[in-house]
Amino acid sequence: CLWSGALADDLEMDGVVRQRHHDTRAVHYRRILDDGAIYAQPFSEGGSAAAGTVAFSTTAVRSDGGWVVRGKKIFASLAGSADYYGTLCTELQHADDKPSRSNTLYLAVPAKAEGVRVVGDWDPLGMRATVSRTLLFEEVFVPDGSELLPPGVYFQAASRWPHMFMTLTPAYMGLAQAAYDFTVKYLRGELPGAPPVKRRMYPTKQLAVADMRLMLEQTKAIWFQAMSEAGPNPTKEQILRAYAAQYSVMENANELAQLAIRTCGGLSMLKSLALERIYRDSRCGSLMLPWTAEICLDRIGREALYESGENDDA
């Protein structure tokens, strides 16, 4: 709802396009509020599209009264459970047109539409509850009015509202907090499911908790600052801070989980307690496209040293 709601309201559209967007998103919102519909957002395809460097290979070819969608999404969270798949695809007027990022379309594909299939298993290191199986679109007809954003507006959003790609960070900020909270309760002997034994009196435990608290507060500080700056047309400094916040949250969540396991000791890694899951889930955060940890580092280094349009050609 962020992309089709507040974010879309900040972007440029002519009056006709904006009115149509208001009408179509009202349909989606009514489904969610009145019918309890679940919308998923399949994104990755196994190539460079999710990183924002090429057009999505999933296509939506214009047809009478709608589009015909063809393609595949991997790591499709809620595959088989969602009612609609908010699918990023490339709109084409004809099947042989050259795909362009500027023609990206954000389309709600009904899960029960003919040609939608869910295949494969889901047995990863972490994020097991997302059930992110592979989603296939085989000549799927999607009617007009299914747009979540008007054609081309996603491309504008990616260029002008880059904080839109930080929407996974709250979950990992929560994991970071959970790792710290687990440690405090465990050392105080107050954790449900663990022996009521206090371990807080040991200096090594106190120092470890202090280190964890410092890392948690530093991570929160940059994250809240970046979130407060989310909006259209951010400055270069704000974009660099967004990359830094994304990197810090995703990496520090796992670092805190590691410290929690080391500090609490062997019992804390039992599957009957939450810390084992927090550790596995948090390790996956730095892999999340389009702003993986590696991409954030690459962009921070380059954009700090180069102004737009600069190069080293003689």
Predicted regions and their residues:
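Glycine-rich flavin
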Residues: C1-S77
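Short, structured patches in soluble enzyme cores that scaffold and shape functional sites
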Residues: F43-E45, R62, K73, L88-E91, ...
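DPxDG-like acidic metal-binding loop motif
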Residues: K72-A113
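Glycine-rich phosphate/pyrophosphate-binding beta-alpha loops
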Residues: I74-A79, W161-L168, G285-M288
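Glycine-rich beta->alpha junctions and the first turn(s) of the following alpha-helix
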Residues: W122-L216
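C-terminal helix-coil-helix/basic helical segment that borders enzyme active sites and/or dimer interfaces
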Residues: E217-S248, Q258-M269
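Non-transmembrane, aqueous-exposed alpha-helical and coiled segments at domain scale
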Residues: A253-N254, A314
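Glycine-rich phosphate/cofactor-binding loops in nucleotide/flavin-utilizing enzymes
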Residues: G266-A314
